[in-house]
Amino acid sequence: LPPRYFHPKSLNFPAEPGRCLPNLYEFKRNYLTSLKSENGARGTVGMPLALGMYELLPLWHAVFTRLGFNVKVSPMSTRRIYEKGQFSIPSDTACYPAKIMHGHIETLITDGVDAIFYPCLTYNMDEKMTDNHYNCPVVAYYSELLNGNVEELKRVKFLYPYLNINSKKELAKELYTYLGKFYNGITKSEVKAAVEYGLTRYAEYMNAVREEGARALKFARVKNKRI
């Protein structure tokens, strides 16, 4: 069957038969959904696949897996997920990606996770290509709003530390200090190793995305397609 693409009005149109264009969105979705986690002795940590978690999932998934947690990722966004969390959205002025985060949180709680992780990040990863790398304030601090508006979060540990992901040393220190408040027995050395592992997995993910992007550009040039 030909691949399918979504119209902005949510209508589903099949692609023209025989046209197999590179699809980086599909590539990234497949990459993220392929991340697996084994049953961990320290419990299950849920990660909502929305806002800033979408691009940083390979990092956090690897960190918590290495620390001995089972990582449960919420499904790809759907209308049903949005509807599940719509009653805890405090403002209509928030962007849709922020609004749907409520549904992802509710879904993870329903799935029975022990904790949910969505950190506050003033800065995104510095890719050395722009003047600054500030996060949008909504992305950076939406955990605070979730904590104040999603009543069901009282049923789980909601982990939302303020972290610096651009310093390996600082990230390990901050995570160790924060997680130690909730989990006994976590050592500095294992957090340091987990951060190292997570940053390596994140770099692999970014390299894979860049390689796929280069492949798509090459395809467009060879086939004389618009770029």
Task: Annotate each predicted stretch with a short phrase.
Residues 1-227:
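An N-terminal assembly and electron-transfer interface module characteristic of large anaerobic redox
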